[in-house]
């Protein structure tokens, strides 16, 4: 979880970059 967030769709993406 460190440095990462989870979108409402459950997709993981970097806090510093756009969802990928």
From Swiss-Prot:
It comes from Tityus pachyurus (Colombian scorpion). GO terms for molecular function: ion channel inhibitor activity; sodium channel regulator activity; toxin activity. It comes from the Eukaryota. GO terms for cellular component: extracellular region. It is found in: Secreted. This is Putative beta-neurotoxin. Residues 1-20 form the LCN-type CS-alpha/beta domain. SUPFAM superfamilies: Scorpion toxin-like (SSF57095). Beta toxins bind voltage-independently at site-4 of sodium channels (Nav) and shift the voltage of activation toward more negative potentials thereby affecting sodium channel activation and promoting spontaneous and repetitive firing. Has the structural arrangement of an alpha-helix connected to antiparallel beta-sheets by disulfide bonds (CS-alpha/beta). Keywords: Disulfide bond, Ion channel impairing toxin, Neurotoxin, Secreted, Toxin, Voltage-gated sodium channel impairing toxin. Belongs to the long (4 C-C) scorpion toxin superfamily. Sodium channel inhibitor family. Beta subfamily.
């Amino acid at each position: 979880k460190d440095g990462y967030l989870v979108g409402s769709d459950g997709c993981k993406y970097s806090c510093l970059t756009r969802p990928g």
